[in-house]
UniProtKB/Swiss-Prot annotation:
ATP-dependent specificity component of the Clp protease. It directs the protease to specific substrates. Can perform chaperone functions in the absence of ClpP. It comes from Streptococcus equi subsp. equi (strain 4047). PANTHER family: ATP-DEPENDENT CLP PROTEASE ATP-BINDING SUBUNIT CLPX-LIKE, MITOCHONDRIAL, ATP-DEPENDENT CLP PROTEASE ATP-BINDING SUBUNIT CLPX-LIKE, MITOCHONDRIAL-RELATED. This is ATP-dependent Clp protease ATP-binding subunit ClpX. Belongs to the ClpX chaperone family. SMART domains: AAA, ClpB_D2-small, zf-C4_ClpX. GO terms for biological process: cell division; proteolysis involved in protein catabolic process. ATP binds at residues 119-126.
Amino acid sequence: MAGNRSNDIKVHCSFCGKSQDEVKKIIAGNNVFICNECVALSQEIIKEELAEEVLADLTEVPKPKELLEILNQYVIGQERAKRALSVAVYNHYKRISFTESRDDDDVDLQKSNILMIGPTGSGKTFLAQTLAKSLNVPFAIADATSLTEAGYVGEDVENILLKLIQAADYNVERAERGIIYVDEIDKIAKKGENVSITRDVSGEGVQQALLKIIEGTVASVPPQGGRKHPNQEMVQIDTKNILFIVGGAFDGIEEIVKQRLGEKIIGFGQNSRKIDDNASYMQEIIAEDIQKFGLIPEFIGRLPVVAALEQLNTEDLIRILTEPRNALVKQYQALLSYDGVELEFEKGALEAIAGRAIERKTGARGLRSIIEETMLDIMFEVPSQEEVIKVRITKEAVEGQSKPILEIA
């Protein structure tokens, strides 16, 4: 409420002492008044303190072993990938702390962004999310297939940065230390090495556009999203300290690796190694293979850390269902416990759920939908059946051959 401009009473700001005639606006509270100038000053102070808190947080980044322990609580398997990510993330934030305090003649540490290669449902997105959460930094996810280079219909690359700014509650300083995960990066690969001379709206052009923000630039972002327009107000964000993690399935890249290794074996004749499965080939990927798949050399050069994830097997999926702190089985047990009902999944049921996920080629991503299909009728009926004290999910229930077993008090 604005101050009363009576001829008899002149209101003054309780903080700076200026009268209502000396400022644009005075806001009244319970026997307290504050002017617009003091409000603006308060905002600046809060902004500076938040920025200092961000910098302070960076000095307390968990060591690689500590990061690995955090990942192990939530992510099953993928040991090599978790180690690579733990080291890369630690070095990234250590680099930021070093840069903030460095002298001009100190070594210039370059940013090491990350490329994750692995099949659908192997945990790429979840790994990135877990890292960001453990570090308490803003996190944003983007889909590379929705992006186009400037001037074409689609989503501008800069809109990725807007998502990060929004995740940081529009605190730009905090966003500038965040993590961005770009999924489906393999879908914007050039189709073959002999690229058409026609305009490539969603392939190489997007790689070039992403390259600019990944390597570090001051980008102008429309605060409301959408396309840029002349005279539009922009938010400036420096991307040099944003960690970019890009991921994709890269279906077929193992064939490129096989071909390269096969040529070397023929060429040298000796010391040949037999690699028996595609998972082993994935661990042999080098920049040359990724370039042959269709990513441009400049883009690959900005992604020096490559983490290959393996296809999850039945045992991995069962462990994912039961072991992590936020395991799906634990979540559904908690849901039914609120109704006073115990929930048990038999071993055969867990194997059947994992088997279905493998059949559908959805990996860990498809586990929840399979449980939802199995549990739908139970979650609908049981809350109204006060006599039910326990529900047992069997293999037959998962396969749709029978209903779950109910135990009555």
